[in-house]
Amino acid sequence: MISKEEKYFENDGRGFDHLRIRDSTPIQPPVPVITINGQTISTAGNITTISGEAKSGKSGFAGILISAALSQNGIVESLDELYVQPNTLGKGVLYFDTEHSQPTHWKNHLSILNRCGLESCPDYFGSYNLKT
């Protein structure tokens, strides 16, 4: 016999049943991509946002994280407590700058590439300036 809930959520041809989460759904623990001092900051498949007061170092910190995410080894220079999972598969890394002018964004972009030892932008890195 089908319960009211099962009947209500029965697949009606729109194909959403495979997306439904139940208490019995087996969920794998998230894979940490960025950790600081052993605490998970970002996990695979999620968006990471950095916020803070003006001139608090957000852009510099973002550049460090992005350069480590672009690297093949995930090494972050001079920051022993910061771990970024190595990007050995060249998974997409997106950077959206909503604050800086294009010249400043370009300078930061070059700094990111330099920090991780790249001479040119890899195909898996999208760096976008959204300041209007």
Which residue ranges define each predicted feature?
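N-terminal pre-Walker A segment at the start of P-loop NTPase domains
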Residues: 6-37
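Conserved inter-motif catalytic segment of the P-loop NTP-binding fold
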Residues: 16, 77-80, 86-132
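Phosphate-binding P-loop
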Residues: 39-45, 85-88
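Short hydrophobic/aromatic beta-strand immediately N-terminal to the Walker A/P-loop
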Residues: 48-51, 94
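Conserved glycine(s) of the Walker
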Residues: 57-58
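Hydrophobic positions on the alpha1 helix immediately C-terminal to the Walker A/P-loop
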Residues: 61-65
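Gly/Ala-rich phosphate-binding loop of Rossmann-like dinucleotide-binding domains
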Residues: 70
